[in-house]
Amino acid sequence: MFRVAEFEKKGGRQVFKGFAVAGYRMGQRGQLKHYRKKIETKDRRKKNYVELNLATGQTDLKGKMIYEKDLVLDKEENQVCRVDFCKGYAAFVLIASLLDFEFPLSFLDKRNQKFEVVGNIYEGKKK
């Protein structure tokens, strides 16, 4: 399961447009297609593109699905972290920021239900 974040070119920049809800599928070789047309998944600044966010398979305190690139509030640490997939660990990790330094805070553990989704990197934190 994944969600698709759509971006469009505006004034030489790529701007987050929204999350697509239909029309995308994954081909047998892993290429993303919109109906029958293969679409761009890299930011080349000349045309619109999309990013895939994998679902973690876990829900937050309110039952909302947690995706890669979501911002979650860790209720125990009282800190907002970004959810990322770490290839080295082959797991989803929580990335915390301290000034300009980012570090893995902890693994996203299914037994640990202390997180609440408060936004994502595209739209920022919800108030």
Label every PLM stretch briefly.
Residues 1-127:
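Secondary-structure transition motif
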